[in-house]
């Protein structure tokens, strides 16, 4: 996966609890990395999750795909990069890349999210987030100090 607007959003050190009997990071541990990446991406776009929760909006994961390329090992420091790739009326897609200490890509993933209210009804993506997400997609974010604007 090569996405021009992927940005490093977090680092994570693999713990013993993340590993399986083969002493590598268990495949089921990766979705937590995507959650960390997603939360930090939103924060960097100026829209931290607590703001949405306060408005009664939630991002439900409706689809996840992951390609595991190389294993992560205990105590490796991983780099998580993420980018918004698609924004629709009540859905959005995010891509992720997890790199190991040597810079090799260990995993790539995509998650698709529905914006829901507290009753699980679909809701429009708020205009201000839509604009920030579209800026991430195109690399034209206009906010001062934004990660897509030097």
Predicted regions: what they are:
Residues 14, 24-25, 61-62, 80, ...:
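Hydrophobic aliphatic residue packing
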Residues 62-77, 83-89:
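Active-site beta-strand->loop segment that positions catalytic residues and contacts the acyl thioester
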Residues 52-59:
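Short, basic/aromatic beta-hairpin or loop at an interaction surface
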Residues 11-15, 67, 114:
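Generic structural detector for well-ordered beta-strands
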Residues 1-47, 150:
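Catalytic strand-loop segment that frames the active site of acyl-thioester-processing enzymes
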Residues 3-10, 43, 73-74, 85-150:
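HotDog/MaoC-like acyl-thioester-processing domains
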Residues 26, 61, 67, 79, ...:
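Conserved beta-strand segments that form the floor/walls of ligand-binding pockets within enzyme
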């Amino acid at each position: 996966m090569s996405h021009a607007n992927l940005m490093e959003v977090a680092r994570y050190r693999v713990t013993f609890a993340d590993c399986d009997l083969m002493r590598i990071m268990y495949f089921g541990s990766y979705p937590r990395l995507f959650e960390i990446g997603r939360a930090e991406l939103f924060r960097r776009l100026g829209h931290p999750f607590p703001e949405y929760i306060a408005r009664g909006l939630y991002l439900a994961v409706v689809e996840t795909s992951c390609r595991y390329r190389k294993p992560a090992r205990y105590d490796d420091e991983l780099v998580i990069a993420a980018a918004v790739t698609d924004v629709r009326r009540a859905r959005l897609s995010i891509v992720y890349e997890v790199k190991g200490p040597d810079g090799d890509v260990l995993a790539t993933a995509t998650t698709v999210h529905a914006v829901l209210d507290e009753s699980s009804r679909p809701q429009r993506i708020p205009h201000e987030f839509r604009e920030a997400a579209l800026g991430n997609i195109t690399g034209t974010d206009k906010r001062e100090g934004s990660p897509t604007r030097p």
